[in-house]
């Protein structure tokens, strides 16, 4: 086992705080509408220019092990806030730095670290309660666009495209972000349920120009096994043909004689039909077939529930207004399923989302909810260069997550104003003893830090602006982008409540741990091995003798 180096109390905390300050100073430069850029060097390719706090934090690794521990713990604040709320990483870093710096000073002055921690925790609990009181629900597209714009570093084009995407697919809809091929941002919306399986044979195509299959008001047959014998299908085909209806068959596979018969009947115009493979595999395939059944008001023909294909009737089939099938995708538009059944299915899947521990499963379940409840929107990010594309895509990701957070828990006035109003509301809070009360005061002072940093990055004097904002009430604050004072909501400067709440709670959590740290242990640096003495002069093979 390698030897360890151990440092204690003040020496440990000062090394840790040095690491915290290095990381925080790099990250907080990006805060606010006039935040600065940070350039990140990469081992290959061109450097990345970013204004995204979490991207900066992730890149930082310090040479000194004890300083690095402080930096890594602060990095945890940024990534935890980003994972939970999607934004607020820089705010969380600024809050944590202020709490740690003041807290460690108080410990050095002889205060009890445990009481300081209790005081900070007490202030944060009161602050979170106050934030919830200030919070207003996001009801309209304008508020959603404003939140997205702020999160995307004041880029209105990103804010508007996210608001439009949310309007089209609903709050439950899935919005995915891809790299575009043009200079402009684009939005593609897929209505209804789409899955990534195309037609089993190109002979089903009935729209030669678009090379797709279009079915109007078709019946939809859902089966969980392979279909190779045409006799199994005869009852259903006869019933559908008698009604002069069209038919979509979704099964594990349609092959051999069955596929050939369907193609021949389709070409002759006896019945307009298309066969596609069921999406997914195993249990996920069964679940997706059930989703389709609920959406279209049909039943999955499965031996597990005592239904066989040859005994199926039109009452077992689903219905939809329109179905489009291309080479790669099938889209079911306006399924005729019962709304209560669809809502029940959505609730059931949401319960599974809450219970699952796998990120992959959660993502797939959320996709299923979207396909049932809303739709899928794809935002294609446009940019002139690859460097700009990556930076812009990261901002769109942030903005989307922040917007979802705003829809979830509402919004508060942005620009650090909400925390200033919280300070005023809980300024009379007292602890059980003097040290706890000092901990509360540390937390209240730290809540000024985000506004101070936004103002400093805009090139103004933080104390002057802070005092003027403190004199105001409600939404009154400072718009760093224009240098004006006024109502932050009217300026369109809003923050999701969830983002500010998460930033404050995560910052206090790490600060509490650091303030109460008494010893730090790291692997001792290896001493360089002494180099062996060089061989003497003389001829080789002569033992270095000189002649």
Curated annotation (Swiss-Prot):
Keywords: ATP-binding, Chaperone, Cytoplasm, Isomerase, Nucleotide-binding. ATP binds at residues 30-33, 51, 87-91, 415, 479-481, 495. The keyword Acyltransferase does not apply. Its EC number is 5.6.1.7. The keyword Ubl conjugation does not apply. It holds the Pfam family Cpn60_TCP1. InterPro entries: Chaperonin_Cpn60_CS (IPR018370), Cpn60/GroEL (IPR001844), Cpn60/GroEL/TCP-1 (IPR002423), GroEL-like_apical_dom_sf (IPR027409), GROEL-like_equatorial_sf (IPR027413), TCP-1-like_intermed_sf (IPR027410). PROSITE patterns: CHAPERONINS_CPN60. Forms a cylinder of 14 subunits composed of two heptameric rings stacked back-to-back. Interacts with the co-chaperonin GroES. Belongs to the chaperonin (HSP60) family. This is Chaperonin GroEL. It comes from Xylella fastidiosa (strain M12).
